[in-house]
Amino acid sequence: GRIPLKDRRYRYSCLNFMLLKEMVENISKMPMNLFLDKEFYKPMEMNCTAYLPLRQFKKEEIVPTVKADYLRKGKVLQGYVHDESAAFFMGGVSGNAGLFSTARDVAKVYQLLIDGGVYNGKRYLSRETCDLFLTHTSKISRRGLGFDKPDVNNSVKSPCAEEAPEEVIGHTGFTGTCAWADPKNHLVFVFLSNRIYPRPFDHKQLMRLNIRPRMQQVMYQALMK
């Protein structure tokens, strides 16, 4: 029988998503980047979304990520993942990092979830799968299944605007990104910035000024007028 776990504690980690990449490849018998390209990105016309983007885009088409990073010996990192685990252990393709995209393409994925797994008339995910992502909330943290959520009990620590309902799911990214889906109001909010370029160790302003939640707040306030 199953023995219940004791002293359960929450730890934020990338390891589970790195393992998910291995699971996808084991089941699909394909590299994850090729599997996603075949099953999602191409049919959804996500033409600006890719792992290892330098294989299909010009360097000038990709925003530089960082300069003078001590791990890259002062070179400009452009077109390759910034996350150290994905970069040095996963070859640039991982479940936790490495995907390059645009706001429009990212919004398509979140719209797919809001619409129950259907995009542009074609089903990509079952409604049951989407419901798991949209409704599950951890009992020991504010997070959902694979996504972050608003902290409805502490607006100061919440990654979302205070006006965001508890149904919202999404995530922020270290390099200055965030994307949120609001199934209650049928909204998608995507914000892509580049806070660690050119100075990798001077990137606190985005968080200090609370830019991402404040921009999301503007969206909600506009809807309330």
Regions found by a protein language model. Name each.
Residues 160-172, 205-214:
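Glycine-rich, flexible loop segments associated with nucleotide phosphate handling
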Residues 1-167:
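Short, surface-exposed loop or secondary-structure junction motifs
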